[in-house]
């Protein structure tokens, strides 16, 4: 693949880290060179070193070996999507299991199947503990969504419901308990899918992404927890736009803002649980500006990239998501 100059590649990386690809032709995107973007971002770009996160390293050691790899070829488009799949250790075909679909940020796109799992909590935490979830992690070969120009999606996004259906039909998935989650590009993809395919998910967890509310036709009917860092201008603005949209539709929601990401986790879970106990189907959590930046590796300069794991660490959030049914 032809290489650009370092400065040009850094520009492309900056776009990709926000979860997008440069688009000129509507839904059929001219994709960015993702293999270069992802490699560059992981090695020299804005991607955190999480080797000091002992909990994450324990998850990687104990949970990641339980994942296997597969692929789905879509009959409508001819496109193929590789995926990571986790089955509970005591999986039995005679039982049924909830399934969580995790979609990573733009740096997880490409051909590396390990990285989407080792980059953070989002792909592994659902396979830990007593939840007994099946976990599906699509690994798209390209960046699949554009939030810079016309807010468009590629065919990879549109085939994802069929991929989910294929996996759910192959394994013993409780179809009323399929959940979606993602960060950045994955957050936007998940929010788009939940709102345009309203029967797809029982609930979704959106972490630092955004999409125009006017392009989310069924968003008000969904069960959502939407988390963003206060200093992530685009994601925080996306929260506010969706709140305004819900208010105009007469739909109530729960919210907690100025949450200190560095506070004791039991305290954070308690505050979040108090909000969730109000019984709203849609809930917003916003970290206080600056608090997600403490303790991150020195190459991280944006709250967007620093904030992903904080939401996934909250058991109150995870338990609420898994308690929802269609």
Task: Show where each model-derived region lies.
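A domain-start/cap signature at the N-terminus of enzymes
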Residues: 20-97, 181, 254-260
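Active-site machinery of serine-nucleophile hydrolases
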Residues: 99, 103-161
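Primarily recognizes the serine-hydrolase "nucleophile elbow" in alpha/beta-hydrolase
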Residues: 170, 176-221
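Conserved alpha/beta-hydrolase "acid-adjacent" motif
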Residues: 234-240
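Gly/Ser-rich "nucleophile elbow"/oxyanion-hole loop immediately N-terminal to the catalytic nucleophile
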Residues: 90-95, 146-184
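Loop/turn elements at helix/coil->beta-strand transitions in domains of secreted/extracellular proteins
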Residues: 95-99, 130-134, 174-178, 197-203, ...
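Sec-dependent N-terminal signal peptides of Gram-positive bacterial secreted proteins and lipoproteins
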Residues: 4-23
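C-terminal catalytic histidine-bearing segment of alpha/beta-hydrolase fold enzymes
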Residues: 228, 232-234, 252-326
């Amino acid at each position: 693949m032809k290489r650009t100059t370092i400065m040009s590649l850094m520009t492309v990386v900056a776009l990709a880290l926000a979860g997008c690809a440069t688009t000129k032709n509507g839904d059929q995107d001219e994709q960015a060179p993702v293999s270069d973007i992802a490699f560059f971002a992981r090695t020299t770009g804005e991607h955190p070193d999480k080797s000091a996160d002992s909990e994450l390293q324990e998850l990687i050691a104990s949970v990641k070996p339980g994942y296997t790899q597969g692929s789905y070829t879509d009959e409508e488009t001819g496109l193929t999507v590789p995926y990571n799949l986790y089955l509970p250790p005591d999986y039995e075909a005679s039982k049924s299991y909830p399934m969580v679909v995790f979609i990573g940020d733009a740096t997880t796109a490409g051909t590396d199947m390990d990285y989407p799992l080792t980059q953070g909590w989002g792909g592994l935490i659902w396979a830990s503990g007593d939840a007994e979830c099946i976990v599906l992690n699509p690994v798209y070969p390209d960046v699949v969504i554009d939030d810079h120009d016309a807010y468009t999606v590629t065919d990879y996004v549109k085939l994802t419901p069929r991929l989910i259906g294929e996996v759910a039909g192959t394994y013993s998935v409780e179809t009323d308990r399929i959940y979606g989650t993602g960060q950045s590009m994955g957050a936007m993809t998940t929010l788009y899918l939940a709102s345009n395919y309203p029967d797809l998910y029982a609930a979704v967890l959106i972490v630092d992404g955004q999409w125009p509310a006017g392009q989310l036709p069924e968003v008000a009917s969904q069960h959502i927890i939407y988390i963003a860092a206060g200093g992530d201008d685009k994601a925080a603005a996306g929260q506010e736009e969706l709140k305004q949209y819900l208010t105009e539709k007469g739909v109530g929601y729960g919210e907690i803002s100025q949450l200190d990401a560095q506070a004791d986790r039991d305290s954070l879970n308690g505050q979040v649980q108090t909000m969730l106990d109000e019984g709203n189907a849609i809930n917003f959590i916003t970290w206080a500006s600056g608090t997600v930046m403490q303790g991150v590796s020195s190459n991280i300069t944006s709250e967007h990239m620093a904030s992903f794991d904080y939401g996934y660490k909250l058991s109150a959030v995870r338990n609420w998501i898994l308690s929802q049914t269609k």
